[in-house]
A protein has these predicted regions:
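C-terminal transmembrane-bundle signature of multipass membrane proteins
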Residues: 41-149
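Generic multipass alpha-helical transmembrane bundles of integral membrane proteins
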Residues: 1-59
Length: 151
């Protein structure tokens, strides 16, 4: 929990490469599985929390994601926006776009996984018990942005 007035939920170990990997995977999933809603359920939701993480407050992407997802869920369950012409977006249903986005997501996520395994082996840290990326400047910046210090 942040040591600031906001008392934000902090996950300092959730760094930019993990966030980008998740965003790519989630967008690929939305575009492949719910194409008609991918613009809203995927792109808009992901951009909003990722923008907030990179440009408003660092280290609390998970909280940004939970809040934007909750607001979108309440809105989409209360308003049938898909039936309104002004919200209508026709998906391309383009197999090339699906494949490229999915391949990019798979490659980026595999790279993050390999990097995480390398860090685990090199530092002998158990990711279930200790934070993994304490050696990176981005980790320290996430802590500092929330009034916290490394232990």
């Amino acid at each position: 929990v942040a040591n600031t007035k906001s008392r934000d939920m902090v996950w300092a170990d959730q760094l930019w490469f993990w966030i980008v990997a998740y965003d790519l995977w989630n967008m690929a999933y939305c575009y492949n599985c719910i194409s008609t809603r991918a613009m809203y359920a995927g792109f808009a939701l992901l951009v909003s929390c990722t923008f907030a993480e990179f440009f408003i407050k660092r280290g609390i992407w998970l909280q940004h994601r939970a809040q934007t997802l909750a607001l979108f869920g309440m809105f989409s369950l209360a308003v049938d926006y898909q039936a309104m012409p002004m919200f209508s977006i026709t998906a391309t249903y383009n197999p090339t776009a699906w494949t490229v986005l999915s391949a990019l997501a798979l490659i980026f996520n595999a790279a993050v996984f390999v990097y995480e395994v390398c860090v685990i082996v090199k530092t002998k840290r158990n990711p279930l018990k200790k934070e993994m990326f304490t050696h990176l400047p981005a980790y320290r910046k996430n802590l500092e942005a929330n009034g916290l210090r490394a232990e």
